[in-house]
From Swiss-Prot:
PANTHER family: PSEUDOURIDYLATE SYNTHASE, TRNA PSEUDOURIDINE SYNTHASE-LIKE 1. This is tRNA pseudouridine synthase A. Formation of pseudouridine at positions 38, 39 and 40 in the anticodon stem and loop of transfer RNAs. It is an enzyme of class 5 (isomerase). The active site is at D60 (nucleophile). The lineage of its organism: Bacteria, Pseudomonadati, Spirochaetota, Spirochaetia, Spirochaetales. SUPFAM superfamilies: Pseudouridine synthase. GO terms for molecular function: RNA binding; tRNA pseudouridine(38-40) synthase activity. The keyword tRNA processing applies. Substrate binds at Y119. GO terms for biological process: tRNA pseudouridine synthesis. Gene3D superfamilies: Pseudouridine synthase I, catalytic domain, C-terminal subdomain, Pseudouridine synthase I, catalytic domain, N-terminal subdomain. It comes from Treponema pallidum (strain Nichols).
Length: 280
């Protein structure tokens, strides 16, 4: 194992044509194109052997990424880590780009060392949406009350049981997740919902976004939203957000995730603002 190096990648992709990050294999064949599948095909071409590419987490179909982390182990000793950037990009479809590559400790794991995942949903708020924005924004023909939405969002902090926003098929052993930051912002017709947590349940962000907007449209009080959150009853969800219009980023640390890391990261987020979108 001493002859194997671990390389950490930063990846951006347009997820429109992909079933998500993770491969979906039937027998020996991939059922639908995936981001992981495309990366592993290229890694195999570069190394002339099968190479596993491990991502920081799964994403739903149609999710775009600006900074997802993934790692692979390479037996190549003489290539500098940054040279994997053009090596991969010359063979990948244009919808997937490697934006950074660096050698890391063998103890770092893209999934288990990840301290935070961030989703951004983009909603185009206008009577008519621009055609070129439709693949990347959810169109709603009204302007929601951003003040009320942020009042709801302010209740999503710290460790919370997210059963109310879990999908029917979610198989997570624990439904608790740790929220770092949740807020709405508005800029040039686009309302953005940003949520950062240690991890998410399957389709949880879609369900949560839909519930927030459903509550805002009904003019629910903050207390009513909190009641849904703590009910642990997914039947109280609002209609889920459609799949398009959201992007994903990951922050990783050389240390395995711990409560101590949580508290440190929460303090750092409060003082660094957009720095939370840096991958490493």
């Amino acid at each position: 194992m001493n002859d194997v190096r671990k390389i950490l990648l930063r990846i951006s992709y347009d997820g429109t044509r992909f079933c998500g990050w993770q491969k979906q294999v039937s027998g020996s064949r991939e059922r639908a194109p995936s981001v992981q599948g495309e990366l592993e095909k290229v890694a195999e071409k570069i190394h002339h052997q099968k190479i596993a590419v491990i991502g920081s987490g799964r994403t739903d179909s149609g999710v775009h990424a600006v900074g997802q982390a993934a790692h692979f182990c390479t037996p190549m000793r003489n290539i500098l880590a940054y040279r994997f950037i053009p090596a991969f990009n010359s063979l990948l479809p244009h919808s997937i780009r490697i934006t950074d590559a660096r050698e890391v400790s063998s103890q770092l794991h893209a999934r288990f060392s990840a301290v935070m995942r961030t989703y951004r949903y983009h909603l185009h708020c206008a009577p008519v949406a621009y055609a070129h924005e439709l693949p990347y924004c959810w169109h709603i023909a009204r302007m929601p009350d951003i003040h009320l939405l942020n009042q709801y969002a302010a209740t999503l902090k710290g460790e919370l049981d997210c059963t109310s926003f879990a999908a029917a098929g979610d198989k997570s052993a624990s439904k608790s997740r740790y929220f770092y930051d949740t807020h709405f912002s508005f800029n040039h017709r686009v309302l953005t919902f940003e949520i950062s947590a240690n991890a998410f349940l399957w389709k949880m962000v879609r369900s949560l976004t839909g519930t927030l907007l459903h509550c805002e449209k009904k003019r629910c009080s903050v207390r009513e939203f909190v009641r849904i959150l703590h009910a642990k009853d997914r039947r109280l969800q609002g209609p889920p957000h459609r799949r398009m219009g959201y992007s994903y980023g990951t922050s990783v640390t050389p240390n395995t995730y711990s409560v101590q890391n949580r508290n440190t990261l929460a303090r750092e987020l409060a003082s660094t603002g957009n720095a939370r979108w840096k991958t490493y």
